[in-house]
């Protein structure tokens, strides 16, 4: 901790876990030597060095000397690991110790606690630690006005059995501790927004989402002057938008569908992502300085270079200067069949055969979508809906086939456009042989 403080990476009073890295020194087992050999070596050393030199060298016994050498090697190995660990802290961003946040008229206080990321996030497949995450990350502890630990209303709830991917975590958390913004891109329904939400759920960070594909205007982001009644007198007062309110807090500001945002809105975001603060010209030139733990997370169907797939209307190329403000790009793809099957099995407890049919159907629909055959991507939300519907209808319909047929039709087929529906039905027929699907409106 003292080393981290000297580097400016840990403020006075900030907490860390007692052990910052798994580098505890092991005590060496005593080395044993055959009694005859031991006596002979001791005699040879003392005879060769002489009594005075032997005493100066601190030699008393060959077993003690060999045990000391063994211990030195263990100490050196542990020291190398600690140096490697501390070097990883060199480029981390400044960390705040504590602060306050206004939430729905109440004041919550937060305390920053440094925790080892490797202990917070496990490999979902093996349940083992991800060794590349052996570094500290700031987490938050929220308290109400009475000092009791509480939950910030904008901190997402954890999703049971959520499947983190090691590569996503390494990139996202590295960007987080270095103070960098992240750009998550991928097809519809891959979990681009869920990734920062579930990271935030673990480290107790609030998430403020802004959907940029709607009718959001510049004033919604920055704020505007409003006329208010002050004791019978009408006065103008500046009302802050989401940007200045979020920037002063430790949080993730998620810019959903950033690649379809309006140009004037994008220029405001570009200015804010520079990290130097936001100048509110509408409020007399007031400068809003960002909290050291404030981060932007963008989600998009593209890498910012326009629609690569030809299926996302409204996606436009982004300004190069804006893209430079997001140095970390994470491609979020659909879960593999194995990952999705494991998730659905743990969540819904459905028979393996049913899970296999659902995930196979989802995979075929996604392939058809990516190849331009349909405009219906079957997302993990859709596979979850099919499982939920199947569990419900299984207790109502006389056969499991009818329950499955109704679940698939309700969750996927009914929302498909008519020019896509026949292809979706063909894929469903191939995956659910005992069911009878139709492309006509039911």
Task: Write out the residue ranges for each language-model feature.
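Surface-exposed polar/charged interaction patches
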Residues: 6, 10, 43, 47-51, ...
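Acidic, proline-/serine-/threonine-rich low-complexity intrinsically disordered repeat tracts
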Residues: 12-35, 57, 96
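AAA+ P-loop NTPase catalytic core and its hallmark functional loops
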Residues: 78, 82-356
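Short, hydrophobic/amphipathic alpha-helical patches that form generic packing surfaces
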Residues: 170-179, 385-389, 406-414
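Conserved AAA+ ATPase small/helical "lid" subdomain
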Residues: 334-336, 340-406
């Amino acid at each position: 901790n003292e080393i981290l403080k000297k580097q400016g990476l840990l403020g006075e009073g900030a907490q860390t876990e007692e052990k910052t890295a798994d580098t505890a020194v092991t005590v060496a087992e005593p080395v044993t030597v055959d009694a005859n050999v031991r006596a002979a070596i001791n005699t040879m050393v003392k005879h060769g060095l002489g009594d005075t030199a032997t005493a100066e060298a601190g030699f008393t016994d060959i077993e003690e000397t060999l045990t000391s050498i063994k211990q030195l090697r263990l100490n050196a190995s542990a020291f190398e690991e600690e140096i490697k660990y501390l070097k990883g802290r060199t480029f981390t961003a400044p960390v705040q110790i504590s602060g306050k946040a206004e939430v729905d008229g109440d004041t919550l206080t937060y305390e920053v606690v440094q925790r080892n990321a490797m202990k917070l996030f496990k490999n979902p497949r093996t349940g083992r630690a991800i060794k590349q995450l052996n570094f500290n990350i700031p987490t938050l502890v929220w308290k109400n006005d009475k000092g009791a630990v509480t939950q910030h209303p904008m901190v997402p709830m954890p999703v049971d059995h959520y499947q983190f991917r090691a590569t996503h975590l390494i990139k996202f958390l590295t960007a987080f501790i270095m103070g960098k913004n992240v750009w998550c891109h991928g097809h519809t329904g891959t979990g681009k927004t869920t990734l920062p939400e579930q990271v935030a759920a673990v480290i107790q960070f609030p998430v403020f989402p802004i959907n940029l594909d709607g009718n959001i205007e510049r004033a919604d982001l920055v704020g505007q002057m409003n006329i208010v009644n002050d004791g019978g007198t009408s006065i103008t007062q500046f009302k802050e938008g989401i940007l200045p309110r979020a920037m002063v807090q430790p949080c993730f500001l998620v810019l959903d569908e950033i690649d379809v945002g309006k140009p004037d809105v994008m220029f405001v975001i570009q200015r804010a992502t520079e990290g130097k603060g936001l100048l509110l010209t509408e409020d007399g030139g007031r400068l809003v300085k960002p909290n050291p733990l404030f981060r932007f997370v963008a989600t998009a169907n593209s890498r910012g270079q326009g629609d690569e797939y030809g299926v996302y209307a409204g996606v436009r190329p982004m300004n190069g200067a804006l893209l430079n403000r997001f140095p970390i790009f994470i491609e979020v793809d659909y879960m593999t069949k194995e990952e999705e099957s494991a998730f659905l099995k743990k969540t819904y407890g459905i028979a393996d055969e049913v899970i296999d049919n659902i995930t196979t159907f989802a995979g075929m629909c996604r392939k058809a979508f990516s190849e331009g055959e349909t405009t219906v991507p079957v997302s993990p939300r859709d596979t979850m809906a099919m499982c939920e519907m199947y569990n419900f209808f299984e207790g109502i319909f006389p056969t499991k086939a009818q329950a499955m047929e109704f679940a698939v039709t309700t969750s996927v087929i009914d929302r498909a456009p008519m020019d896509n529906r026949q292809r979706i039905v063909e894929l469903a027929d191939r995956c659910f042989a005992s069911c009878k699907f139709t492309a006509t409106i039911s």
